[in-house]
Amino acid sequence: MAEYIIYVGQIEEYQMLNDRQSLDAIFRKAQSAVVGGEVVALVRQNANGTEYRFEEISTLEDLNVYKKNVYKYVKEA
């Protein structure tokens, strides 16, 4: 099964920078993946380079819940 990977460290970096444009692009791709029947994997990359997959999103409802949580920490422009 195909999947789209979201690296959570990258999401956190964009949150700190208030980079809505980059976050929007990631979530557009994730939404397309879910609509196309793919799974969205949330992955954290450790300092030593190993990856830890801690959640999989397969529905638009779950993706929107995660997206809302992410944007909660982004300041309005």
Per-region residue spans from a language model:
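A short, charged, amphipathic alpha-helix used as a generic interaction element across diverse proteins
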Residues: 21-41
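Short, mixed-charge low-complexity intrinsically disordered segments
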Residues: 35-77
